[in-house]
């Protein structure tokens, strides 16, 4: 597969990931309101879980081609998950004086995202 084909597939994965992030974020606002950045937390945890699955899938040769790793890892997950939004959410919480929510957001994103990546990895490594 040529470089331009791979770039096209990465871009497609990125478009799907970005649209997914928007939809998940909007759904979280409908469910929980805007008082806490649930959308960012959700996409980061889900994306970390999928990344764990993806890495294990390559280790177990379930997905053995490099283009899939790039399309899913760089494209889809790169657009789905977001450290910049996570950072901005915390700046806004800090400006509002919501230090407890800011600390909770940081703790939940770090602990749940790392846990989700580990769980996803372990699920396929035991296969």
Curated annotation (Swiss-Prot):
Short name of one Pfam family for this protein? CRCB
Transmembrane stretches, by residue range?
4-24, 38-58, 71-91, 104-124
Record InterPro entries: FluC (IPR003691)
**What is this protein's function?**
Fluoride-specific ion channel. Important for reducing fluoride concentration in the cell, thus reducing its toxicity.
Q: Where in the cell is it found?
A: Cell inner membrane
Family, similarity comment: Belongs to the fluoride channel Fluc/FEX (TC 1.A.43) family.
A GO molecular function held by the record: metal ion binding
Q: Which residues bind Na(+)?
A: 78, 81
**A single GO cellular-component term on record:** plasma membrane
Is Signal set as a keyword in this record? no
Q: How is its activity regulated?
A: Na(+) is not transported, but it plays an essential structural role and its presence is essential for fluoride channel function.
User: Could you tell me what this protein is called?
Assistant: Fluoride-specific ion channel FluC
Instruction: List the membrane topology term(s).
Output: Multi-pass membrane protein
UniProt keyword terms in alphabetical order: Cell inner membrane, Cell membrane, Ion channel, Ion transport, Membrane, Metal-binding, Sodium, Transmembrane, Transmembrane helix, Transport
């Amino acid at each position: 597969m040529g470089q331009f084909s791979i770039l096209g597939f990465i871009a497609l994965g990125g478009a799907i990931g970005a649209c997914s992030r928007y939809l998940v974020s909007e759904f979280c606002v409908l469910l929980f309101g805007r008082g806490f950045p649930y959308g960012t937390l959700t996409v980061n945890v889900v994306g970390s879980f999928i990344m764990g699955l993806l890495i294990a899938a390559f280790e177990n040769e379930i997905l053995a081609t490099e283009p899939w790793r790039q399309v899913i890892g760089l494209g889809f997950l790169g657009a789905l998950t977001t450290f910049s939004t996570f950072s901005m959410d915390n700046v806004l919480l800090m400006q509002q004086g919501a230090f407890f929510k800011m600390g909770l957001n940081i703790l939940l994103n770090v602990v749940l995202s790392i846990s989700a990546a580990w769980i996803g990895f372990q699920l396929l490594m035991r296969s």
